[in-house]
Regions:
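Beta-strand-rich recognition/accessory modules
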Residues: 2-58, 67, 77, 142-151, ...
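N-terminal onset of structured domains
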Residues: 48, 55-58, 156, 161-165, ...
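Asparagine-centered strand-capping/turn motif at beta-strand->loop junctions
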Residues: 64, 172-178, 319
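Extended, loop-rich substrate-binding clefts of extracytoplasmic carbohydrate-active enzymes
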Residues: 114-165
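Beta-rich strand-turn-strand
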Residues: 164-169, 178
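Active-site/ligand-binding surface loops and adjacent short beta/alpha elements
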Residues: 180-267
Length: 324
């Protein structure tokens, strides 16, 4: 699913960057300036003094924070933003960013004594490499430093690449570094999509799939409807599905296609009224402008990664005109 440029890309490499400093920002910007590409890339200090990348390609713009390797913006020229960001989001060390694309590993949901949704979304990732094709596609590669926070799991290595062009391509690789232990792994790209009105969209591609309904204490159900519509809180873990999912937004005249590989689960979530009011980093009315369609492997689809083996989760997000 990853795009292969027709000409060899150029790279801005060097030592990994994992924390903001004047020296590191200056050095990376100096390396980037030497790349021959129609795209523009700037490394700078963002909100909360968190380091971030701003990317502009011939097709689109994007923003990525090192904190969580978190994509907070992707917008095709002439189109509405693809990703939703809460106006109440925190930008601070140790807190997740609300919106965009949080990375969830090695567990999904809440675990007693461990917290919510793993460690990756609240950690500073290392910036490993930036590559630009001569046509303008930009690929940024990150790695997650080892942490004692995940000491209840066998040691693992995580790498993440983001390719920005006419589409947004994501690849999350997790390798079990243990020589003798299996790594139980839940992974998820918890993507928040911007929509005109959550009650007006339809989500297709999951008819006939079984799911766990978290709103009803994980009741097991089968989706018999042609499409999902949002009219109350929705929190569903769809299982054993590799299907492409589409978000149809008639008011924006847009369809978003979520293509994936290495994923057997799709999560669909909208917090609706009451849960929105309980979340301190989410606006009371913001549920009207977003829906999460998340790709990964969760619950019954938890992966068992053999010693020294790896899993690769890939997602491509495609935005096009509705009916085109």
């Amino acid at each position: 699913m990853q795009r292969t440029p027709s000409k060899p890309p150029q790279s801005a490499g060097g030592e990994p960057i994992h924390q903001q400093s004047t020296t590191s920002i200056t050095r990376v910007n100096s390396q980037i300036s030497n790349l021959e590409s129609p795209s523009r890339i700037t490394f700078l200090e963002g909100p909360g003094e968190l380091p971030m990348l701003e990317v502009s390609t011939p097709w689109s713009t994007a923003e990525i924070f090192l904190h969580g390797a978190h994509v907070t913006r992707f917008k095709k020229h002439g189109d509405a933003p693809l990703l939703f960001m809460s106006q109440c989001s925190r930008f601070q060390q140790g807190s997740p960013i609300r919106g965009g694309i949080p990375i969830i590993i090695p567990w999904f949901g809440f675990r007693e004594g461990l917290g919510q949704h793993g460690i990756a979304r609240t950690r500073a990732w290392e910036l490993r490499d930036i590559r630009c094709s001569r046509e303008g596609t930009v690929t940024v590669r990150f790695s997650l430093p080892q942490s004692q926070e995940a000491s209840t799991f066998p040691p693992f290595q995580a790498e993440y690449s983001v390719s920005i062009g006419a589409t947004l391509d994501l690849s999350l690789e997790v390798r079990n570094q243990s020589a003798d232990q299996v790594l139980p792994l839940e992974n998820c790209l918890h993507t928040y999509f911007e929509v005109s009105d959550s009650t007006m969209i339809t989500i297709t591609g999951l008819k006939g799939s079984k799911y766990l309904d978290q709103v009803e204490q994980f009741a097991r159900k089968v989706d018999s409807e042609d499409s999902i519509r949002i009219g109350s809180e929705v929190d569903r873990l769809y299982l054993d599905t590799a299907a492409t999912v589409e978000i149809n937004d008639p008011q924006l005249g847009r369809v978003i296609r979520v293509e994936k590989s290495g994923s057997a689960s799709t999560v669909v979530w909208n917090p609706w009224v009451e849960k929105s009011r309980r979340m301190p980093d989410f606006g009371d009315e913001e549920f009207q402008r977003m829906v999460c369609v998340e790709s990964g492997n969760v619950a019954d689809n938890t992966l068992q990664i053999a010693p020294l083996e790896k899993s690769v989760l890939q997602v491509r997000l495609v935005s096009s005109r509705l009916g085109a």
